[in-house]
Amino acid sequence: MALPEMKRVLLKLSGEVLMGEQDYGIDPAFVMELAKEVKAAREQGLQICLVIGGGNIFRGMAGAAQGMERAQADYMGMLATVMNALAMQSALEQLGVHTRVQSAIQMDQVCEPVIRRRAERHLEKDRVVIFAAGVGAPYFTTDSGAALRAAEMNCDALLKGTSVDGVYDSDPKTNPDAKRYDTVGYGKVLADNLKVMDASAVALCRDNDIPIIVFSIREKGNLARVLAGEGVQTVVQN
């Protein structure tokens, strides 16, 4: 599959993948495996930004559904993404990959604030930049945060690593006949409500012509294969 030439990418990981085979929290061994994938991608000469969800620790919408105030629950979810970012930073630096965490909620003792020009300098110095705390405001998902940072950092593509190997016309977990798309347009994703990212994230990528590449991060070596245009994936583009 022909992919756009990529020099800088943003990798979005769902928080759930950090659980490994656990039901909750962070599996340090699996985080290390993910860090090895990121290191291998960086060694291909790519500049890499990362955004990690927080669903393995706390999901704001789930808290709101159980009676919490939505804004308060969303802030808790943002803090969960900072914990995940620090876990990934620790794993990457154990592998010798220099990493910086920037949070949209300022917490100077543990990470930097989001400053675009500073992030640019980090990338130019071959560091991985992990953006945490979403967009820093409630009612926005980490998918929207990933799309925003991809646009802000002029990324050539947004790679979404999940537990499924692409975009399907229905849920492959419940429908064995679900069809996987090799490529699909932003418009169809929005019109058919395909489960790629939330609508605002897809629209932001569409408006800034940022391809979204959906693939399974659980398969060892899959990130490198996807970046080489190999393996199973779905590309969302115009």
UniProtKB/Swiss-Prot annotation:
<dbReference type="Pfam" id="PF00696">
    <property type="entry name" value="AA_kinase"/>
</dbReference>
<comment type="pathway">
    <text>Pyrimidine metabolism; CTP biosynthesis via de novo pathway; UDP from UMP (UMPK route): step 1/1.</text>
</comment>
<feature type="binding site">
    <location>
        <position position="171"/>
    </location>
    <ligand>
        <name>ATP</name>
    </ligand>
</feature>
<feature type="binding site">
    <location>
        <position position="168"/>
    </location>
    <ligand>
        <name>ATP</name>
    </ligand>
</feature>
<dbReference type="GO" id="GO:0006225">
    <property type="term" value="P:UDP biosynthetic process"/>
</dbReference>
<dbReference type="GO" id="GO:0033862">
    <property type="term" value="F:UMP kinase activity"/>
</dbReference>
<keyword id="KW-0418">Kinase</keyword>
<dbReference type="GO" id="GO:0005524">
    <property type="term" value="F:ATP binding"/>
</dbReference>
<feature type="binding site">
    <location>
        <position position="55"/>
    </location>
    <ligand>
        <name>ATP</name>
    </ligand>
</feature>
<feature type="binding site">
    <location>
        <begin position="12"/>
        <end position="15"/>
    </location>
    <ligand>
        <name>ATP</name>
    </ligand>
</feature>
<dbReference type="GO" id="GO:0044210">
    <property type="term" value="P:'de novo' CTP biosynthetic process"/>
</dbReference>
<dbReference type="InterPro" id="IPR036393">
    <property type="entry name" value="AceGlu_kinase-like_sf"/>
</dbReference>
<protein>
    <recommendedName>
        <fullName>Uridylate kinase</fullName>
        <ecNumber>2.7.4.22</ecNumber>
    </recommendedName>
</protein>
<keyword id="KW-0665">Pyrimidine biosynthesis</keyword>
<dbReference type="InterPro" id="IPR015963">
    <property type="entry name" value="Uridylate_kinase_bac"/>
</dbReference>
<feature type="binding site">
    <location>
        <position position="162"/>
    </location>
    <ligand>
        <name>ATP</name>
    </ligand>
</feature>
<keyword id="KW-0067">ATP-binding</keyword>
<dbReference type="InterPro" id="IPR001048">
    <property type="entry name" value="Asp/Glu/Uridylate_kinase"/>
</dbReference>
<dbReference type="InterPro" id="IPR011817">
    <property type="entry name" value="Uridylate_kinase"/>
</dbReference>
<dbReference type="GO" id="GO:0005737">
    <property type="term" value="C:cytoplasm"/>
</dbReference>
<feature type="binding site">
    <location>
        <position position="59"/>
    </location>
    <ligand>
        <name>ATP</name>
    </ligand>
</feature>
<comment type="subunit">
    <text>Homohexamer.</text>
</comment>
<comment type="similarity">
    <text>Belongs to the UMP kinase family.</text>
</comment>
<keyword id="KW-0808">Transferase</keyword>
<feature type="binding site">
    <location>
        <position position="54"/>
    </location>
    <ligand>
        <name>UMP</name>
    </ligand>
</feature>
<keyword id="KW-0547">Nucleotide-binding</keyword>
<keyword id="KW-0963">Cytoplasm</keyword>
<comment type="function">
    <text>Catalyzes the reversible phosphorylation of UMP to UDP.</text>
</comment>
<feature type="binding site">
    <location>
        <begin position="135"/>
        <end position="142"/>
    </location>
    <ligand>
        <name>UMP</name>
    </ligand>
</feature>
<feature type="binding site">
    <location>
        <position position="74"/>
    </location>
    <ligand>
        <name>UMP</name>
    </ligand>
</feature>
